[in-house]
């Protein structure tokens, strides 16, 4: 096993512990808590894959961080902070919407690029809007927290979410997952539109009528793919 992989995991465990302490002291906001829960699942998955104990890894990570801080100067910290852009958190969904339970009559699912796409293939002839919570860096979607598809009456019919045990995803992974979701739902004559935030930060476009940011050929391709691969 690569030593850098172990070191990275140990440091991630300790930094998660620090963030957890902040949450326990009510010193953080809702997006912070969202990322904390998501990262906890990811660390458990990585720990299982690597065969490492989380408690031991956290203690080793503490030693590594303390060694770095002892040799770090205030000037170096100022330079690092100034040169590193901070991601923004975009929320289409409320806490209630992102945590609401949902059920599928005809479940279909597919894994793509570290993301799980789940949808109810029993949904037909509905108007559906896609909403997502995600972070943005350099004016582009960086990390997806959750994407959900809602009918006009608020029912959830599809979800895209990161797989905790997998090592992350790219903007292209998110776009591909959305394409699969749109293709699968449109197969049953549903009308799909994406939120302005999804269109702007995933595809870099603004569509005033809220239509799905995919050309017809790509949507047909995704529809065929969902039928053949799911």
Swiss-Prot record:
It holds the Pfam family Flu_NS1. Residues 223-230 are annotated as: PABPN1-binding. The keyword Ubl conjugation applies. A motif (Nuclear export signal) lies at residues 137-146. A motif (Nuclear localization signal) lies at residues 34-38. Residues 180-215 are annotated as: CPSF4-binding. InterPro entries: NS1, NS1A, NS1A_effect_dom-like_sf, uS15_NS1_RNA-bd_sf. Keywords: Eukaryotic host gene expression shutoff by virus, Host cytoplasm, Host gene expression shutoff by virus, Host mRNA suppression by virus, Host nucleus, Host-virus interaction, Inhibition of host innate immune response by virus, Inhibition of host interferon signaling pathway by virus, Inhibition of host PKR by virus, Inhibition of host pre-mRNA processing by virus, Inhibition of host RIG-I by virus, Inhibition of host RLR pathway by virus, Interferon antiviral system evasion, RNA-binding, Ubl conjugation, Viral immunoevasion. GO terms for molecular function: protein serine/threonine kinase inhibitor activity; RNA binding. Its main location: host cell. One of its GO terms (cellular component) is host cell nucleus. The keyword Transferase does not apply. Residues 1-73 are annotated as: RNA-binding and homodimerization. Inhibits post-transcriptional processing of cellular pre-mRNA, by binding and inhibiting two cellular proteins that are required for the 3'-end processing of cellular pre-mRNAs: the 30 kDa cleavage and polyadenylation specificity factor/CPSF4 and the poly(A)-binding protein 2/PABPN1. In turn, unprocessed 3' end pre-mRNAs accumulate in the host nucleus and are no longer exported to the cytoplasm. Cellular protein synthesis is thereby shut off very early after virus infection. Homodimer. Interacts with host TRIM25 (via coiled coil); this interaction specifically inhibits TRIM25 multimerization and TRIM25-mediated RIGI CARD ubiquitination. Interacts with human EIF2AK2/PKR, CPSF4, IVNS1ABP and PABPN1. This is Non-structural protein 1. It comes from Influenza A virus (strain A/Chicken/Germany/n/1949 H10N7).
